[in-house]
Each structure stands twice: as C-alpha cells, then as structure tokens.
Amino acid sequence: MERLWISSMEDAAIRDGFEHLRPGKDYDRLYEAAVCRAGADWLVGINATRLFSVLYGVTLNVGRVMSPTLALLVQREAEIQAFTSRPFYVPEITCGGLTASGDKLAEKQAAETIRRECDGQTASVLSVEKQVKTVQPPRLYDLTTLQRECNRIYGYTAQQTLDYLQSLYEKKLATYPRTDSQYLTEDMQATAASLILWLRDNMPFGKGCLEEPDIDRVTDGSKVTDHHAIIPTVEIARTDLSALPSGERDVLALIAMRLLCATGQTHRFEAVTVVLDCAGHSFTAKGKTVLQAGWKEIERLYRMGLKQAELEKEDPADAALPELTQGQTFEPAGRISSRNSTISQLRCCSPQIGRASCRERV
C-alpha cells in the first residue's frame, strides 16, 4: 500500500505527490505514537477523574493535556491579578538635541533633588559607544503566531483568525491553516519563488523588496511534520482581492507580508549609547541609525496601510542621535518624568511551556 503525503492543496503539489507516492509502512510509527497517546489519555482520565470526583463530591474531568495547560493559565492570570503598579520617577536632561535619562527612582523627592543639583550646571559627554547590530528576518507563520499577530494588529480573536484562514484555504488562497511549522518543504521552493515575484509587483508593501529573496532560509523539510508554514497560494494572482470580506483580506495581506519579510534581507543598524555627566549624576541617551533597512522596510510599508489607531508608538530609542564627541559640553535643561511599572512581562508565555517559539520569547 502506498500513501499520498502532501502538505499543500495546490494543484502542482498534488500532482507531485501522486508522482511520488510513499510506502505505507513508512508511517507505521505515526500510528504507534497515536496509540500510545490514546492509551496515556485513557489511563490518566479513568484514574484521575474518578479520584478527584470522589474528593470533590462532583464530577471533575481530569485530562493529560488540558488540565496542566489550564493550570498554567490560572497560575499566570493569578500573577497578573496580584500585580500592583508602582510609580517611579526618572530625572532627565535635554541638551545638544537629545534627551538623556537618569536612574529610575521610587521617591519623587530624590528625583527633584537631582534636578535641582543639575540646574545651571554644565553637562559633559563621558562616552559615545557605537555598535553595529543585526535583526534577522522573522519566521513564517504557523497558526499560533498568526493568531497572535492578528489579535495584536487587528484585534481578531483566535477563533476569528482561524475562521478567516479556513475560508481562505477553502478558496485555495492560503495553505493549510492548522499547522505548527514555520518552514517550507524543499518541493515548495519553486512555488514560493514565483509567488514572491508576484507579491513584489502587485502588493503595496512589495516595493520594499530590493534584493533577491532568500528562500533557503525558510526551507527545512526536517522541521515540517504534517503541513508546512502558512503562506498564500499562486491562486492569489487570479483573484480579485477587493471582493474578499475585510477580515479575510486582512489575514491574507498579513501572511503575504510575512512571506516577503521572512525571505527578505537582514536589518542592520548602528546602536548609539551616549553617557553624560551633570553635577556628578550620570544620564544615558540611546538611539540608532539604520544602515540597511532590509525586511523592516517591507513591514514599514505594510503598516503604513493600516489605520492610524493600529500603528504602534515609536520607541524613542529608535530615533537617530546627533553626532557627539567625548568631552563635549552643554548647558542642559532638567525635568522629571513620572511613569508606572507595567505588567507586560507577566503577559509573556510561561518558561514551562515546551513550545520552542515561546521559550525564545521568555
């Protein structure tokens, strides 16, 4: 017996699959793994469910996967609810075309003291450190990362994103949605290359592609189990995209943009850190100068098409700093910035989660 084993529903991929049918025995281990999982689920469920139902006096279903996953969510939500925001104060000086910040202080009076001590004093540049850094292109989307991005950019729930993506899949405009891989298989390289050429010529954000795409970076068949990463299909070139519902159009544009970004060039910039001294107190200013926009230019053009409310605030550390030299002096103007501690770090995924992409973010 031979099996048709494909990771894409495109006509070319299906034809190639039928031309390269694989022996059924190659997949016996998948069956055996499924039997092991089913047995483990049954053993945990039949024993733990009976135990905890007796202990609590009501039926309480316990599972091998859902119960520990739910426990992680409950634990993290409890940490978020218990978090208390605390204000802190940062003395700042403005001089030489930049704003430099001191240390975070819990007491406003301490920040006021530093500001007063800096009044009428001269600020001098202690050091100027420059370092060339790179930001590698992002990976292609799997279902989880796409759902996260759609929620952050458009506010769509995970189910909405899946519904839109499923509809695109049924219209043959996107590849299989329920995938956990962020790579393509080797047989998809030619399709991806032709698709990228069309996106570069026909999508507004495609104009940011100035170099040859690096498809090898997103190709690794060993990291594809059942289905490869989510990308558009070549059917997009024969479809009136304006006729699609807005949600489907948003999701399709996002995965198209990610394909161009993932195969784009590395983003290179020069990070600049300036340390100043004023009245014996140290102040730091950070900025950067872009040397090669790379894939971030594609992302920038994509975000230009979003509504203003959907654009993220620019980080002051991303702005370019004026040219400064060690020993340069200025007459600064002082002030105090008041901010609150946030819970953004608490909303990161737990280090106990086994997913590789989550562990990288923690």
What kind of region is each of these model predictions?
Residues 1-361:
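Toprim catalytic domain recognition across nucleic-acid enzymes
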